[in-house]
Amino acid sequence: MPNNDYLTIYGEQIKSRLLIGSALYPSPAVMNESIVASGAEIVTVSLRRQQSAAAGDDFWQLIKNTGLKILPNTAGCHSVKEAITLAKMCREVFATDWIKLELIGDDYNLQPDPFALLEATKILIDDGFKVLPYCTDDLVLCQRLNALGCEVLMPWGAPIGTGKGLLNSYNLKTIRERLPEATLIVDAGLGLPSHACQALELGYDAVLLNSAIAGAGCPITMSRAFKAAVEAGRFAYNAKAMPEKDVAAPSTPTMGMPFWHQE
């Protein structure tokens, strides 16, 4: 892979194509070691998840100590007003105009609300935010978000926390083909390193992981596995895989074979 093969997010060049979440780990120490082992340069955080000032201070100090770029999110928001308010709070607290916009429309499968997402995206972009919207694998929705000014899109692979992988690789592939200039990050639903590898093989620019690492038997080892998988997937994409065929083709030359083997 060339040394200048960077992930680009709103003009910033990032070496790692793995973004990592900061929730659900069995302990702060495991979270810290897992983040380091992943090689990630961007960590997502939720302002809502800190229950007490003391716990919040400890958490932020751990995150700051990693030296990674923070991508705050609006996890848990169900309305446009709620998401806008939280996004503005995040901008003040974290001193960044990046926001991972999450607006849930269904509590059963945590599917994003496409209508509220479009409305909130426009408001935030008009207010100077650089929005990274968490969305479904719907082509038209992704096109609309891109047209509003989202340079980065984050379609799901499957519902959050399911670990099912890429349920609709056709849709994801279509989005990649139709939006060649957008930075595309598969967010949610990945469970195995092979899922992340597949996303990169499809031409996606990165993956965002949380449950797949935090919920593993050994999160630190799983972080290393995902790091290797993402690198392998990007290598494979850049190498341009052989075309798939419906008919077998021998890999061994037939020249020099006995004539009775060529009948």
Curated annotation (Swiss-Prot):
Gene3D superfamilies: Aldolase class I. The keyword Ligase does not apply. 1-deoxy-D-xylulose 5-phosphate binds at residues 161, 188-189, 210-211. It is an enzyme of class 2 (transferase). The active site is at 100 (schiff-base intermediate with dxp). Keywords: Cytoplasm, Schiff base, Thiamine biosynthesis, Transferase. It is found in: Cytoplasm. It catalyses: [ThiS sulfur-carrier protein]-C-terminal-Gly-aminoethanethioate + 2-iminoacetate + 1-deoxy-D-xylulose 5-phosphate = [ThiS sulfur-carrier protein]-C-terminal Gly-Gly + 2-[(2R,5Z)-2-carboxy-4-methylthiazol-5(2H)-ylidene]ethyl phosphate + 2 H2O + H(+). GO terms for molecular function: thiazole synthase activity. Its main location: cytoplasm. One of its GO terms (cellular component) is cytoplasm. It comes from the Bacteria. One of its GO terms (biological process) is thiamine diphosphate biosynthetic process. CDD domains: ThiG. Its EC number is 2.8.1.10. Pfam families: ThiG. Pathway: Cofactor biosynthesis; thiamine diphosphate biosynthesis. Homotetramer. Forms heterodimers with either ThiH or ThiS. Belongs to the ThiG family. Catalyzes the rearrangement of 1-deoxy-D-xylulose 5-phosphate (DXP) to produce the thiazole phosphate moiety of thiamine. Sulfur is provided by the thiocarboxylate moiety of the carrier protein ThiS. In vitro, sulfur can be provided by H(2)S. This is Thiazole synthase. The gene is thiG.
